[in-house]
């Protein structure tokens, strides 16, 4: 049995220039995940369920657990000294860490502390998403938004933690995707899936079909394609949509499938956040042999202009994403209604 800590140190030895700072940073994320895991498991017994009465910069109601997870991760990252600051879906602006080694720290972290938190009241899987970049601004100076507004190709590490029937941490540093399952009796994450790859073909599609009338024509046509009978392509595909990006992505990664959150008239740029959700998941998908686009363009090539920028998102088994892109290219004329 190999723990996450042992695995990271082992991989660090493959690089003579490694300083151990990224290893320490991942250890902080691991600690934050353990704390969130603990409190999610007793969420119905203590007063951390439901809305907080506060809205974020997008005007969305923040759940109590959103704020709890944000504060715990922020504290864990600040305490280590390897992080100059963070950007979070739950924060209006970047958070600059002061004191200690922060001004000379190499890295910045972007995160969605608790994805799918609206599901927590009904005991549905939720997750934490994180993305790590090297800072751009000079050492010894405060970081700025410039350090965070980098394309996804610049990510050093990305990953997520899914809190479900078991808690699992999945991450990549650009050398494959690896997954670790949490053993609460030992308090450690143990390697359970090494070098995870998407199956060559997929048979699941994940999209909120309740919004079908609002979708662009190409997306509607692709959904109908997924539902048609065809033995050669093993259609119809199975529809599976949890409403938690991490949970839907995780299932499709292991089983083969596509996750879609397209543009609509009410959300012409899509609804998912490019920096906190799309980029880290796109990095993981590509490292696992999958594909991630906005329907036309590679997600990781998009140069962000603002912290809370949104994007349409198509991610999963490469052939399925390419099929969806084909329908979008073939039926481009009808705008989302």
Swiss-Prot record:
Protein residues bound to substrate: 115-118, 208, 241, 271
Residues at which Mg(2+) 2 binds: 112, 115, 277
Family: Belongs to the FBPase class 1 family.
Co-factor requirement: Mg(2+)
Domain of life (superkingdom): Bacteria
Official protein name in the record: Fructose-1,6-bisphosphatase class 1
Organism (species): Yersinia pestis
Biological processes, Gene Ontology terms: fructose 1,6-bisphosphate metabolic process; fructose 6-phosphate metabolic process; fructose metabolic process; gluconeogenesis
CC terms in the record's Gene Ontology section: cytoplasm; cytosol
Cellular localization per UniProt: Cytoplasm
InterPro entries: FBPase_C_dom, FBPase_class-1, FBPase_N, FBPtase, Fructose_bisphosphatase_AS
Cofactor binding notes: Binds 2 magnesium ions per subunit.
EC number of the protein: 3.1.3.11
């Amino acid at each position: 049995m190999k723990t996450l800590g042992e695995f990271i140190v082992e991989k660090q030895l493959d690089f003579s220039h490694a300083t151990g700072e990224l290893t320490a940073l991942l250890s902080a994320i691991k600690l934050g995940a353990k704390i969130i895991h603990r409190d999610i498991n007793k969420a119905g017994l203590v007063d951390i369920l439901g809305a907080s009465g506060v809205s974020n910069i997008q005007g969305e109601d923040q759940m109590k657990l959103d704020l709890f997870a944000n504060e715990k991760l922020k504290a864990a990252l600040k305490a280590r000294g390897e992080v100059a600051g963070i950007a979070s879906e739950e924060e209006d602006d970047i958070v600059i860490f002061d004191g200690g080694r922060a001004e000379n720290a190499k890295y910045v972290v972007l995160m969605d502390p608790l994805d799918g938190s609206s599901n927590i009241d009904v005991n549905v899987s939720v997750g934490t998403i994180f993305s790590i970049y090297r800072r751009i601004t000079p050492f010894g100076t405060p970081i700025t938004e410039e350090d965070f507004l980098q394309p996804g190709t610049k990510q050093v590490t990305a990953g997520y933690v899914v809190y479900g029937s078991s808690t699992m941490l999945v991450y990549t540093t650009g050398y494959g995707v690896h997954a670790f399952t949490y053993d609460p009796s030992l308090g450690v994450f143990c390697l359970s899936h090494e070098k995870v790859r998407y199956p060559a073909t997929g048979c699941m599609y994940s999209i909120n079909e309740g919004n079908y009338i609002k979708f662009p024509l190409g997306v509607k046509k692709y959904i109908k394609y997924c539902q048609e009978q065809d033995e050669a392509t093993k259609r119809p595909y199975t529809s599976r949509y949890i409403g938690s990006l991490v949970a839907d992505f995780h299932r499709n990664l292991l089983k083969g499938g596509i996750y879609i959150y397209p543009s609509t008239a009410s959300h012409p740029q899509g609804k998912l956040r490019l920096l906190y959700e799309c980029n880290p998941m796109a990095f993981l998908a590509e490292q696992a042999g999958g594909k991630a686009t906005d329907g036309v363009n590679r997600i990781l090539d998009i140069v962000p202009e603002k912290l809370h920028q949104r994007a349409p998102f198509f991610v999963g088994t490469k052939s399925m994403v390419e099929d969806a892109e084909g329908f979008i290219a073939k039926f481009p004329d009808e705008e989302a209604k």
